[in-house]
Amino acid sequence: MSDNLKIGLQYLTPKHALTRLAGKLASAKMGWLTTAVIKWFIKQYNVNMDEAKNPDPEAYSTFNNFFVRELEDGARPINEDGSVISHPADACVSQFGPIMDGKLVQAKGHVYSAQELLGGDETLAAEFMGGEFATLYLSPSDYHRVHMPCDATLRKMIYVPGDLFSVNPLTAENVPNLFARNERVVCIFDTEFGPMAQILVGATIVGSIETTWAETVTPPTGPAVKTWHYPLSGDDMICFKKGEEMGRFKLGSTVINLFAPNSIKFDDSMENGIPTRMGTPFAHIVK
């Protein structure tokens, strides 16, 4: 099948309906059939079950339970240096670099707007103008829980409705504004080095996006942007330590981080296309 045909089918496919169906099937308890699908998936995508807290495929009552499986203790050591920002997920680096003229690189020759990514919030987008961004793609074989790259306090969460194009190199190179048009959950944190955004982007077959404080954010999908504000003082603050879980994908997609200007420097190990492991050095705080 040609690339043009694959992209054309992306536009024609009823992606939301397909994703709702996939979500229902993935959360259904179907006994031996669930186990058979899990075993096929492990073999097909070479999933390393040795690092799972429960490596037995038959222990998972639904496919979703398997997909968001916990890792055994110590499987992802967190870099303890306070000046180091750690990778939030097991993934592959898609793109990273400066936010120039309010634009992020989607793929070679393709850019999109930070303001659109953040749900159209011009004031919020201004906090990241001239800063840095990184886009991390989670493949089917990856661990699909997302963790905090640094100590932080949650300020705001924004649900941005949108499409559900598949996310992969082909769509990144051929679907304009891919990450700013797909459904997403934008999480804004305050840190010792300034504001940070951690954005969970949906895709076809991504049954749900969850956070540890709000649980399932989507589905259901909605027609309008929704915003939640959180206290920045008092007993009700939502604070995280580096390495703590903050969200997960039930079938999953992409994490995008935004950093304020002059706040971080990416680690020398960062390159487009390299695999990442949660907890390893991602960037360094600029003192």
Swiss-Prot record:
GO terms for molecular function: phosphatidylserine decarboxylase activity. Heterodimer of a large membrane-associated beta subunit and a small pyruvoyl-containing alpha subunit. InterPro entries: PS_Dcarbxylase, PSD-B, PSD_type1_pro. It is an enzyme of class 4 (lyase). Is synthesized initially as an inactive proenzyme. Formation of the active enzyme involves a self-maturation process in which the active site pyruvoyl group is generated from an internal serine residue via an autocatalytic post-translational modification. Two non-identical subunits are generated from the proenzyme in this reaction, and the pyruvate is formed at the N-terminus of the alpha chain, which is derived from the carboxyl end of the proenzyme. GO terms for cellular component: plasma membrane. Its cofactor is pyruvate. The active site is at D90, H147, S253. It catalyses: a 1,2-diacyl-sn-glycero-3-phospho-L-serine + H(+) = a 1,2-diacyl-sn-glycero-3-phosphoethanolamine + CO2. NCBIfam families: PS_decarb. It is a peripheral membrane protein. GO terms for biological process: phosphatidylethanolamine biosynthetic process. Catalyzes the formation of phosphatidylethanolamine (PtdEtn) from phosphatidylserine (PtdSer). Pathway: Phospholipid metabolism; phosphatidylethanolamine biosynthesis; phosphatidylethanolamine from CDP-diacylglycerol: step 2/2. Keywords: Cell membrane, Decarboxylase, Lipid biosynthesis, Lipid metabolism, Lyase, Membrane, Phospholipid biosynthesis, Phospholipid metabolism, Pyruvate, Zymogen. The record marks G252, S253 as: Cleavage (non-hydrolytic). This is Phosphatidylserine decarboxylase proenzyme. Binds 1 pyruvoyl group covalently per subunit.
